[in-house]
């Protein structure tokens, strides 16, 4: 049986960030295993259709602490300006990086680039062992350690098990850590697109009666589209050919960026919120989407998860001789409670307010957007959380 200080299940962005963060903070003194089921081929870049994620300013500040941002900045697209509007109504608000002032409000990175970069970083951390492709098939918790059996027959023992294996976490299911589910009755249609006008680092969020439509700036003048629709509308939209889809998208978004010229591969997924009230258990910590999965309306999902990672890494440093000790896990749970609760509430409220076409909601949200555009003090609380500059 191979012995480690920490075993992390899930080697995507959350799990790998935690491994690199703990390695950096501990000076490589803790042995870490990362178990990942899917073998990534970083040489087979998806090109135009590469999936992207937005990193808040707070997330960038955290990544800097682990010496991970400098390399990532080379392929990141800065968000200089955010425009928020309500389709068919006058309410709108703008946020510009010069108002803060900061270099950028956030950055957009492509997941393939991050994966390749993290793979390069991994080679510099000899204490991190990537077990891939492999998946957890059995977990046994003892008083002082956790024993994990993999599907290839390998046995691992560690002082701490970290579940970073997504919303449908196999670890959490095996250990019966329950999740609260809420169906937003919306489907996200995602694609990369190109417009006639250059995005110039601008991000857009447009609220419609069926749900929000967001465009994030990417490299090579592409934009990442997330279009939230009612299920029947999403089915119809997905059935359109590219020309028809362009027309529908143009009608929903408008002409602020000119004509939509190129539409990449489209995919869709149902939007559900999952939340595990209990983000720790005996010798178990839960991070990222395994702890909570949010609606993409405010781009808070990964940015909330990175704050899980930073807090857990700091908590581990308080008791490096036993990363799974009760004092570590109770500190992590206590410090994350308020931020998780507030971000979850904010995201859910935004969905219900801005995905609703009742007259009272339309009037309220348009007055709210207009007020925020004219009163910085009203914009500040939402801006602070959007930028990820919140206490952990």
Residue spans of the language-model regions?
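Conserved N-terminal helical subregion
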Residues: 75-174, 182-187
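Conserved FAD-binding catalytic core of PHBH/FMO-like flavoproteins
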Residues: 63, 160-259, 263-266
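N-terminal FAD cofactor-binding segment of flavoenzymes
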Residues: 46-87
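FAD/FMN-dependent oxidoreductases across multiple families
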Residues: 233-235, 239-326
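C-terminal helical "tail/cap" subdomain of flavin- and related membrane-associated enzymes
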Residues: 314-392
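Glycine-rich FAD pyrophosphate-binding loop
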Residues: 23-48
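Beta1/beta-strand and adjacent pyrophosphate-binding region of the FAD-binding site
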Residues: 1-12, 33
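N-terminal Rossmann-fold NAD(P) dinucleotide-binding loop
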Residues: 15
């Amino acid at each position: 049986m191979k012995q480690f200080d920490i075993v992390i299940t899930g080697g995507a962005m959350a799990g790998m960030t935690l491994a690199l963060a703990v390695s950096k903070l501990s000076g490589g003194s803790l042995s870490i295993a990362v178990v990942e089921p899917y073998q990534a081929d970083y040489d087979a870049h998806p090109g135009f259709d590469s999936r992207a994620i937005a990193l808040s300013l707070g997330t960038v500040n955290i990544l800097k602490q682990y010496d991970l941002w400098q390399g990532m900045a080379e392929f990141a697209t800065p968000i200089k300006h955010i425009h928020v509007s309500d389709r068919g109504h006058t309410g709108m608000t703008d946020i510009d990086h010069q108002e803060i002032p900061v270099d950028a409000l956030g950055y957009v990175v492509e997941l393939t680039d991050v994966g390749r970069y993290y793979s390069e970083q991994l080679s510099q951390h000899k204490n991190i062992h990537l077990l891939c492709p492999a998946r957890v098939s059995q977990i046994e918790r003892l008083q002082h350690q956790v024993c994990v059996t993999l599907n290839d027959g390998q046995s691992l023992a560690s002082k701490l098990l970290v579940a970073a294996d997504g919303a449908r976490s196999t670890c959490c299911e095996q250990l019966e850590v329950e999740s609260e589910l809420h169906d937003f009755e919306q489907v996200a249609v995602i694609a990369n697109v190109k417009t006639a006008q250059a995005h110039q680092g601008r991000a857009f969020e447009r609220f419609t009666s069926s749900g929000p439509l967001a465009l994030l700036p990417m490299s090579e003048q592409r934009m990442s589209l997330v279009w939230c629709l009612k299920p029947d509308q999403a089915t119809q939209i997905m059935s359109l050919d590219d020309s028809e889809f362009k027309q529908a998208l143009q009608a929903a978004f408008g002409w602020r960026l000119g004509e939509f010229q190129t539409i990449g591969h489209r995919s869709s997924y149902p939007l559900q919120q999952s939340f595990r009230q209990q983000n720790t258990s005996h010798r178990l910590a839960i991070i990222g989407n395994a702890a909570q999965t949010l609606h993409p309306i405010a781009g808070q999902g990964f940015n909330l998860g990175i704050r899980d990672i930073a807090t857990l890494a700091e908590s581990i440093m308080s008791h490096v001789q036993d990363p799974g000790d009760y004092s570590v896990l109770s500190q992590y749970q206590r410090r994350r409670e308020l931020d998780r609760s507030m971000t979850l509430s904010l995201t859910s409220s935004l969905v219900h307010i801005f995905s609703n076409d009742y007259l009272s909601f339309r009037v309220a949200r348009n007055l709210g957007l207009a007020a925020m555009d004219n009163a910085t003090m009203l914009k500040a609380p939402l801006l602070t959380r959007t930028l990820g500059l919140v206490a952990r």
